[in-house]
């Protein structure tokens, strides 16, 4: 380990190039009091996590540990503050503790706890799911809380805060409309975060074909939700001062009661289907990159649509991890508009981007019963030196396990480039990323 952080997990997460990491929740955020997680670990109080099984939270992972993890993996921290059971004073003090350079009592306390330099946390969520576990508020009630809390959240030193309001669960346009109508234009709000989960009908390892199709089709609904939420925000925010986020998204599947007792309520098996869902979601975000400022998978380790699973000393990369790995070449590139044949979902999903003289295309075939011979035609220029990687397994219930951790991993895949076209064959249940040299543009 590295100061208590599992070394293997740190190395694998750093390799993905994760840009932003969100913490401490989730529903837990609105019952979390930050002072519980600072100071000597052995003196930190133990609290009951009332949302997820009433287990004891020992607070050994607090603010300093979170910031250290972010630095180790190269991610910017995003902290979700407590609006549901907290106070404006508590959140205001947390910002000062993290960001004030030196000379105040809170900055001196941070230094005494081992961090003389400010953490420079830019991203702050003002509550989480306040329509539900974050306080069961109406849009108007939450808007009043947001106005009050945000009044006291200030920039310190050279850190300019990016304040994020709680948006709807799913495509709830009524929540957005009523919240925006209750917000005066002078209110400091930089981001608006919706959540989107695709709930599984079956146990994660026992999906039927019908359940597979139903779950994967929900990612076409995700794209519709992004378009409609952004369009509604634009009515109140014509200059797009407020960025749209999807700061919780992913699949949420069922497990057996005995598995819940062993691993916890939010554990789930990560299968080939999970990887397809992740890739479909990422393709949506790529296609709608001009309408989004941030998206955060739920979650990272051992919970829901996880990248990594651990069991004692063992740690494995899930198929979700490898879906993200295949998408990594798009990071830092510019989105390219794509047109694909229309078909009832789930169907072929495509996103593309360009980085200088390179074109990157990710294709997802979510069908279980048919392969696809795909030709990608470039509107300008020619392609050459093409290479491709594939993540594929013929069984959508197959998974990387602690016994077979490398069952499903990316492999090289044939692709051809000729003139202005790329050609690649996709077997059923496959994710392929193609990279090619672009010339003549």
Model-derived segments and spans:
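Non-catalytic accessory regions flanking glycosidase/transglycosidase catalytic cores in CAZymes
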Residues: 1-177, 181-191, 219-223, 227-255, ...
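Histidine-centered catalytic micro-motifs
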Residues: 194
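Active-site His/acidic residue clusters
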Residues: 197-214
